[in-house]
């Protein structure tokens, strides 16, 4: 289950979105759940329904993307996060506002810095680029952290941000 959504604009991480969702099933991996710090019973009473959460997510995207822009899903190991978001967008809204438009930060770093794949761990990237933030498994904080990594890679290789 997708239990929380965190997003931010990569060029303005203070412009962001966060919500927690009600679980859609009672099946879960205890180890994976323990990393999140969530309690499923609490989320059942406080989380948004998937329909509402995805609609709110789309509303936030629409409010932050101008008519001549397209939203791009940027993530660290983008295939993992995008697959959950794509499934929920399609199941609950019928379409994904990102479509298939995405950028994978790991792959971007791998290509720009010509490193071994083992060196694309976020901890190695943080060390090399002197990132100030870290990942803590909170969806919003992770999105802001990933935006920092994305911008540091661009600054290092292109001398500018997006």
Residue map of PLM features:
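Conserved non-catalytic scaffold segment of RNase H-like nuclease domains
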Residues: 1-79
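Conserved beta-strand scaffold positions in the cores of enzyme catalytic domains, especially
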Residues: 16-18, 102-105
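Active-site-proximal helix-loop-helix substrate-binding element of RNase H-like nuclease domains
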Residues: 23-43, 103-144
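Non-catalytic, well-ordered alpha-helical scaffold segments
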Residues: 51, 55, 82-83, 103-106, ...
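Residue-level signal for well-ordered alpha-helical scaffold segments within enzymatic catalytic domains
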Residues: 56-59, 83, 87, 110, ...
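Acidic, Mg2+-coordinating catalytic module of metal-dependent nucleases/exonucleases
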Residues: 72-79, 83-84, 121-162
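Substrate-recognition/cap helix-loop segment adjacent to the acidic, metal-dependent catalytic center
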Residues: 79-101
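Substrate-binding/catalytic groove segments of enzymes
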Residues: 92-96, 115-123, 157
